[in-house]
Amino acid sequence: MVVLSIITRNGARKGLVFRRMLEATLQVPYSSMVLVDDSDDDSTSRVVKEFADAHGKELLATRSRLYGYVKATRATGRQTAIDIFLENFSDNVLIQLDDDVILRDGWWNEANSALNGPSIGMFYGATYDVNDLNEAGNVQMDGARLKALLMSFLERGRTNDIALRRSALAGIRGSFGIIPPELHLYEDAWLMRAMMCLGWGIIIGFTGAIQHDPVKLSQAEAGVVNADIDLHYTRVASKYGIIRSVDLLDDILKLPATLAALPILTYRRTRKLGPVKGLKVALAETHVKLLYRYVKVKGALTGSCNKLKYKHQLTKQQ
């Protein structure tokens, strides 16, 4: 019925989070696992193999297929899991799970109920970010948080913890080909748009999952901003028109507001990081926000299903 896939790079370095991610999947009635592991060593695959052996799960482990691209990305990892599922299994549902996401009790019941609807192609469990795993039991969904989550999903999709219908995946492969390998940050937006273009429904479940990445948190606390990376992948996503504004007028008005907020942001960052680094971080953050808002507006005005095909699509599957 169900195949579980995990997309990871150095997941074992996340320690307890990674192990709890694995344990939480036991609520799902799967017998087979697909591990797409682009790690720097074999520590992650060893942890997953130990888990699979302990719980009687069949494990198929591999690195990403590159599909003619120069390196592994989140898009190649996700597409590899999809292709392995379509090629090697007859099950109707593929679950894709990121390595820092812990499913909350009841996640599978909600996903299974959603996919009983024959027109539903994707189920996404809302992810609740926490700074400390001890906060996991106290997460509450208030109105503001719910609105922010829904707006973000409708703008650019989410794939942290998703259940996908086989026929929807096969239809996407046939109509649009592979997820563009260059979409390292926005492969989730592409997948959502492809689902919608083919008329498949998407359901968000609010039992959801906890997301906690200790590596990213430590970088954020140190003031690490990967602005060049964010800018590059936002520009790449713009080619496909997959990031789209939900409230067009609001996003247009917020373009100048983002610039107006720069002095306050600079003050806050320099207080925390010092004058030179603080200014650099504030400018980088503002640049990223401006470009993202512009791309959202552009996507809402010009995005279409015809833009989804990868520009360098291969003639045969690798």
Predicted segment positions?
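Short beta-strand-to-loop acidic/aromatic patch adjacent to the donor-nucleotide binding site
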Residues: 90-102
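A recurrent flexible, glycine/aromatic-enriched loop bordering the glycosyltransferase active site
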Residues: 146-164, 183-184
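A conserved acidic beta->alpha catalytic loop
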Residues: 37-47, 101-102
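Acidic donor-binding loop at a coil-to-helix junction in glycosyltransferase catalytic cores
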Residues: 181-193
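Short, well-formed alpha-helical segments that are part of the catalytic scaffolds
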Residues: 11-27
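Catalytic core of nucleotide-sugar-dependent glycosyltransferases
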Residues: 208, 219-248, 290-301
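Short beta-strand-to-loop element that shapes/binds the nucleotide-sugar donor at the catalytic cleft/hinge
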Residues: 123-136
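Catalytic beta-strand/loop signature of glycosyltransferases that borders the donor
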Residues: 202-214
